């Protein structure tokens, strides 16, 4: 059996929450294109990002530890994949558009330079007389201009909702380009979830990498409420050595704890806010996704 794009969009209408962004309701693309026969818009956007040069280049870009310190530690690429996995899991539980969340997650770090935030700060200083440098702005520039893959338009010609989600990655006024994307409105719920998935991914895996490298010791974390809760859940006492199995258990339970809290809290806020549509979410005076 073959499912056409229209059938997949109809399936979205039947299964996604009313406050989710539905593919068929997209504002479209800057440059008109024929729709795909078998892929909804955001699935198509996701696949365009995966095939970019910028996405492949994330492999050797620093997250925290530079590459020669070991192949265990996260890079921008592995971080991005973990963000996408967490974002998609949350989206599924909340009835959101998984393809849209994952697409924003996959695109959110495309503009990062080498050497992590140190590299970004160095570029910002060097470019201060020319508008500075911001990795969020660069991510948008990559997908709208620099990735030259089509003869009829610059960039990837991604859907409006993907670009809006990238622009409003942290707040509704993240970068100057936000003025093109209804700055008076907050990001749609898929954008809010993508942002929080980023936070959850880097806090958990930075802790994992820090503990494995020895730069963070368990003694430094003793007394922190969440650390104590997670350790108690696996039956580990303060005096015990943190072996690799215990570390993996802790990180796994930490991610599950935070994801569960985010899903339950966001659902609670949605019910209290009585939102019915994606636009209702954007008109709220606060981000409805949270802990």
Residue spans of the language-model regions?
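Short helix/strand-bridging catalytic loops that position acidic/His residues to coordinate divalent metals
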Residues: 121-129, 181-183
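Histidine-centered, transition-metal-coordinating active-site segments
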Residues: 1-80, 84-90, 97-98, 136-291
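A generic membrane alpha-helix/interface feature
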Residues: 113, 126-127, 216, 274
